[in-house]
């Protein structure tokens, strides 16, 4: 099986986090998002322990909210001692409404509105991660009006190609995010920020991309970022104390994907950071990273019911399910690979394209999936590793209600997000 929280009973029925998924589908309906809470907590603890073991005082992993944002997720993050990053006032509101400590929240985004800035300042969040000149000036004005000094990091682009999907590659010079080190724009913004009396520039942020497997990507990022910290000290006399390398560690979506030893990677990264800062005479910074996918992806599974099977002789076979791009748009966006299991049959395998119910030819969950040849209407299919960027990217296209999110623990099963109703679909209509 793809992950050790997935198994089969002696009768061949698929289990997830120890539970029979066919029974979960029967009780809660489909499509259905399942989340293994124990796995989420274990992934948090893995990061937290590695940070305690290898990085300096105050260093902290921040959960990247965009991976999966709902109130119970923030409660778990708070209980485990994580920080979080948010990229909108909506994510910030959700975190605060769940009781997440404001001082452990970092507000990202390349186009924060005046309302975003005012809301974050009014709530006393820990840091804004400033992206551009206009934001710096607007945030200075907002902080001055509130008579506070707001801590910030400055987002810069180090010019690193992580060799991942183009749509999730964010650290190259021409990225829409941050200011480029190579062009001198990052240094200009550092100098501007240091002149603004109501902003307290504490450090730098960068993020090179998502689903990163290469061993040297973060070391190459440090090759840019640490000398840039040294250049800032040389040109301004200021030693910035925080360095945030963003997120991006890859996860296994298929058997072909590498299984990354994240604690070992973090130990190597910490050693390299120590070596580079000592070489340039800099103190070891307070270190931050922003894991999202590697916290929640393998804690998720989505269940579907097959609605029809269509065979086109000489061409292909389709298994159409009761969800699709509305609950998982990632294949439609960038052809993301997934592992799909039949939940309760194990006969002779045939190749099917698993497709959704939306009125789009591109509504594909996964092409070329090997399923039992007798797959038919009413069968349950399970898509693995859907904990990240499925619920959070879901939509109501074709007026389809979004699925429930059901949390699984060793002692209980509970809904974290209820299934939407038709009344919800029209609840905002006038």
Regions found by a protein language model. Give the residues of each.
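Flexible loop/turn segments at secondary-structure boundaries
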Residues: 69-72, 93-94, 113, 160-162, ...
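A charged N-terminal "starter" segment
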Residues: 1-151, 187, 191, 195-200, ...
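Structural preference for beta-strand elements that scaffold enzyme active sites
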Residues: 60-62, 81-83, 102-106, 127, ...
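Short acidic, glycine/serine/threonine-rich loops at helix termini
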Residues: 73-74, 97, 117-122, 139-142, ...
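Charged (often Lys/Glu-rich) extended helix/loop segments that serve as interaction or gating elements
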Residues: 268, 277, 282-430
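Active-site loop/helix belt of alpha/beta enzymes
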Residues: 2-3, 159-308, 371, 400, ...
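Hydrophobic face of alpha-helices
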Residues: 41-44, 222, 266, 382
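Active-site beta-loop-alpha junctions enriched in small/polar residues
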Residues: 64-70, 89-90, 110-112, 131-133, ...
């Amino acid at each position: 099986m793809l992950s050790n929280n997935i198994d089969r009973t002696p009768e061949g029925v698929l289990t997830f986090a120890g539970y029979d998924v066919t029974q979960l589908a029967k009780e809660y309906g489909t499509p259905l998002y399942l989340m293994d809470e124990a796995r989420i907590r274990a992934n948090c603890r893995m990061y937290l322990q590695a940070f305690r073991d290898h990085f300096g005082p105050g260093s902290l992993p921040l959960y990247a909210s965009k991976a999966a944002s709902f109130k119970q997720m923030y409660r778990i993050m708070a209980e485990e001692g994580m920080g979080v990053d948010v990229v909108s006032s909506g994510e910030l509101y959700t975190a605060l409404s769940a009781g997440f400590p404001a001082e452990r929240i970092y507000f990202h985004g390349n186009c924060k509105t005046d309302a975003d800035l005012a809301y974050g300042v009014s709530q006393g969040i820990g840091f804004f991660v400033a992206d551009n000149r206009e934001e710096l000036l607007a945030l200075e004005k907002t902080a001055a009006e509130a008579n506070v000094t707001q801590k910030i990091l400055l987002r810069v682009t180090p010019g690193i190609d992580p060799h991942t999907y183009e749509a999730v590659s964010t650290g190259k010079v021409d990225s829409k995010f941050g200011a480029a080190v190579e062009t001198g724009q990052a240094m200009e913004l550092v100098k501007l920020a240091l002149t603004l009396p109501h902003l307290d520039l504490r450090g730098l942020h960068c993020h090179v991309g998502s689903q990163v497997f290469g061993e040297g990507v973060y070391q190459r990022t440090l090759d840019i970022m640490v000398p840039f910290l040294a250049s800032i000290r040389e040109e301004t006399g200021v030693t910035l104390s925080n360095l945030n390398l963003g997120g991006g560690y890859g996860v296994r979506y298929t058997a072909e994907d590498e299984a990354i030893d994240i604690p070992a990677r973090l130990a190597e990264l910490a050693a390299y950071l120590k070596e580079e800062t000592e070489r340039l005479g800099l103190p070891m910074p307070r270190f931050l990273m922003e894991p999202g996918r590697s916290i929640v992806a393998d804690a998720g599974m989505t269940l579907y019911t097959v609605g029809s099977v269509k065979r086109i002789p000489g061409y292909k076979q389709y298994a159409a399910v009761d969800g699709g791009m509305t609950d998982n748009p990632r294949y439609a966006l960038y052809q993301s690979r997934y592992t799909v299991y039949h939940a309760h049959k194990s006969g002779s395998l045939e190749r099917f394209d698993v497709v959704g119910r939306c009125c789009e030819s591109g509504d594909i969950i996964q092409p070329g999936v090997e399923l039992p040849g007798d797959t038919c209407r009413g069968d349950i299919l399970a898509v693995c590793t859907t904990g990240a960027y499925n619920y959070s990217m879901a939509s109501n296209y074709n007026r389809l209600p979004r699925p429930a999110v059901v949390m699984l623990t060793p002692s209980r099963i509970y809904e974290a997000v209820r299934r939407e109703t038709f009344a919800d679909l029209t609840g905002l209509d006038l």
